[in-house]
Amino acid sequence: MEENNLQCSSVVDGNFEEVPRETAIQFKPPLYRQRYQFVKNLVDQHEPKKVADLGCGDTSLLRLLKVNPCIELLVGVDINEDKLRWRGDSLAPFLGDFLKPRDLNLTITLYHGSVVERDSRLLGFDLITCIELIEHLDSGDLARFPEVVFGYLSPSMIVISTPNSEFNPLFPSVTLRDSDHKFEWTRMEFQTWALYVANRYDYSVEFTGVGEPPAGAENVGYCTQIGIFRKNGGKATESCLSEQHDQHVYKAVFTTSYPSLQQERFFKLVLVNEVSQQVESLRVSHLPRRKEQAGERGDKPKDIGGSKAPVPCFGPVFTEVEKAKIENSPTPFCVGDKFFVPLQRLLAYPKLNRLCANEEMMRSVIADSIPLSSDGSAVVADLRNYFDEQFEF
């Protein structure tokens, strides 16, 4: 449940008017971005597959995390259904996601519900985040919160951030940073609570934060304090999870899936496109050599100089090992007006090699989309096409 960060400088929700502009503490980047970046850095480091953000608010953190290639399931939970419906579309795939599919599947779901309710669809997660959430809970919900999140959901890692009240005196006329906050803890209060919860539910915890204090006020600590909880022994086993009864109390208000190379139609689309591009690149690079050979035989090839010459395309930069692998692979060749590129040659290129494990796999995927030689060992293309003639190439 994220705080408002007005004018990208205030950390005081709803109280910016009370803080004189000349005394407002400036955070660069803004504090809310520092919190999100902190979570993203953890995701980059630990590569969780299943991530849930409790109290996801306007889904800003989810939008930041959805581009991470390791995540396969991303879930947001919030009590404000209207906000979830309004922001859901911002999590849907864009055109670029279809043009360049992810390696792994990604499903994003937004649930309307309370974080102190048990829903079995959030079992077995690698990471659950609670960014600026707990201070919005009343005493009853705060008591139930550990039972649900740590005891029932029991993810591998939990990140909880909350305001550090020791920082508040640096903001003029501020007691609580948001009118909806039920409390704000000192570092000692937060750490006492966190250590008790960690010990009870078999987690370890370490403390850090974001939002450096100004010079001369280092003793107050970070503006936002953060606890990182790690499950001792890792994630709950599949057998333990299977013993949990299904409880679907949350209401799904938005869900979307991203195209990926794990989906047959998108894998084929990408592979056919990559093969076609590589064959075309090899064909075009082969034409000047053909003209040189024609000149040696006494033929008179057309002039390729001047403005009609096509602009050369710059391909990827290969390592010495990759270059050697390509050079040692079967060479493209011509038979009459046809240009042949062996599949083994294509598989020598790193990008295609990453997509396809072997020649048989490549052949089976592209056979009905790209012309192949009679024995299926090479892609066949016309040596010259309409555009070559137009450019007198």
UniProtKB/Swiss-Prot annotation:
Protein name: Small RNA 2'-O-methyltransferase
Gene Ontology MF, one: RNA methyltransferase activity
Cofactor binding comment, as recorded: Binds 1 Mg(2+) ion per subunit.
Top-level enzyme category: transferase
Cross-referenced InterPro entries: Hen1, SAM-dependent_MTases_sf
Binding-site list for Mg(2+): 132, 135-136, 181
Location(s), subcellular: Cytoplasm
Catalysed conversion reaction: small RNA 3'-end nucleotide + S-adenosyl-L-methionine = small RNA 3'-end 2'-O-methylnucleotide + S-adenosyl-L-homocysteine + H(+)
Binding-site positions, S-adenosyl-L-methionine: 36, 55, 78, 83, 115, 131
Family indicated by similarity: Belongs to the methyltransferase superfamily. HEN1 family.
One of the GO BP terms on file: siRNA processing
Keyword Methyltransferase assigned: yes
Cofactor(s) needed for function: Mg(2+)
Main location: cytoplasm
Basic and acidic residues composition bias: residue spans: 290-305
This protein's record includes keyword DNA repair: no
